[in-house]
């Protein structure tokens, strides 16, 4: 990449870092990216509302007849931020939006994809290429809105990456097979009956059942043998309110469940639900379940991995 283009995408990344936006609120971020692309290259930009893509179309038959036999491919990046306070205030491009920052590096992801757009515009490709700029990755909603494009354009392969600290600059780190665990948020609500704090026996307090479930899950992961990585992380527990005259009548516990294999994620959830029902029955409580942020496992295609490895070796990247 020419230094001029590199300087442009570094400046773009700093601009995005200054103005982070939360998932489903990224209109200004999207506009900044579209403006950058339209000001610097001639490729077509297609705005799909919450997200957009850039389209490189080969010159069919006349100059590149071989392109007709090569299926389209896509590259994808995200551009939403997180509800986390910026802790690098000394940087000249620190977040200007209180309580919001690019802690997952999506400013870098989107800028890198914009850099690829610059290269495509200058150097071309031997097939049609689609650059997908996706919103709302952090809450698991954005990708679903982009999926129809795959069928619409008959895209055969999609490539993406995540920045990863701790490796040499410019290193290309590849993982065969599963690269990201399947995961989902599970909230279990225990409903009993409130009573005066002086007569707790006349109510049904969920605290004992929730305490039992916490201990069960802690022991479960130590005692149970799964084929691959499995995690159940407690992210929130709420029981009653801070009212010293009332014995709690409702409580809930939330887990993030993760597993390298989808079937083991399902198995883990069922084990937790079975015990929750047992503990609830012992205390005379009712149960309900809610789910958030479901993600299937992400498994890398072996042939795609090999193509990336070969490209990195040709460029002498570590």
Positions of PLM-derived features:
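Histidine/acidic-residue-rich, glycine-tolerant segments that coordinate divalent metal ions
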Residues: 82-84, 89-101, 107-108, 123-233, ...
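Metal-dependent amide/peptide-bond hydrolase catalytic core
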Residues: 211-318
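Predominant activation on well-ordered alpha-helical scaffold segments within soluble catalytic domains
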Residues: 10, 34, 114-118, 144-147, ...
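Acidic/His- and Gly-rich active-site-bordering loop/insert found
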Residues: 1-102, 111-115, 119-127
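Active-site beta-loop-alpha junctions enriched in small/polar residues
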Residues: 21, 78-80, 136, 164, ...
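Conserved active-site and cofactor/substrate-binding residues in soluble primary-metabolism enzymes
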Residues: 4, 24, 28, 32, ...
């Amino acid at each position: 990449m020419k230094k001029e283009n590199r300087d442009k995408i570094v400046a773009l990344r700093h601009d995005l870092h200054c103005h982070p936006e939360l998932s489903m609120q990224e209109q200004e971020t999207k506009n900044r990216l579209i403006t950058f692309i339209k000001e610097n290259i001639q490729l077509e930009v297609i705005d799909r509302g919450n997200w957009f893509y850039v389209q490189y179309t080969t010159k069919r038959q006349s100059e590149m007849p071989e392109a007709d036999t090569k299926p389209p491919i896509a590259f994808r990046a995200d551009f939403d931020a997180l509800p986390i306070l910026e802790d690098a205030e000394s940087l000249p491009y620190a977040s200007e939006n209180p309580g919001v920052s690019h802690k997952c590096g999506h400013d870098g992801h989107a800028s890198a994809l914009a850099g690829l757009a610059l290269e495509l515009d200058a150097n071309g490709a031997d097939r049609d290429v689609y650059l997908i700029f996706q919103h709302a990755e952090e809450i698991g909603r954005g990708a679903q809105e982009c999926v129809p494009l795959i069928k619409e354009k008959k895209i055969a392969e999609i490539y993406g990456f995540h920045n990863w600290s701790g490796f040499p600059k410019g290193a290309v780190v590849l993982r065969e097979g599963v690269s990201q665990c399947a995961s989902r948020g599970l909230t279990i609500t225990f409903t009993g009956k409130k009573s005066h704090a002086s007569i707790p026996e006349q109510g049904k307090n969920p605290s004992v059942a929730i305490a039992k479930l916490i201990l069960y899950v802690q022991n479960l992961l130590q005692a149970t043998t799964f084929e691959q990585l499995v995690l159940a992380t407690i992210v929130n527990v709420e029981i009653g309110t801070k009212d010293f005259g009332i014995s709690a009548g409702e409580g809930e516990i939330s887990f993030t469940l993760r597993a390298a294999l989808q079937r083991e994620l399902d198995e883990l959830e069922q084990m937790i639900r079975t015990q929750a029902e047992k503990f609830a029955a012992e205390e005379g409580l009712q149960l309900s379940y809610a789910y958030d942020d479901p993600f299937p496992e992400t498994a890398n295609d072996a042939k795609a991995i090999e193509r990336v490895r070969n490209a990195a070796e040709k460029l002498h990247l570590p």
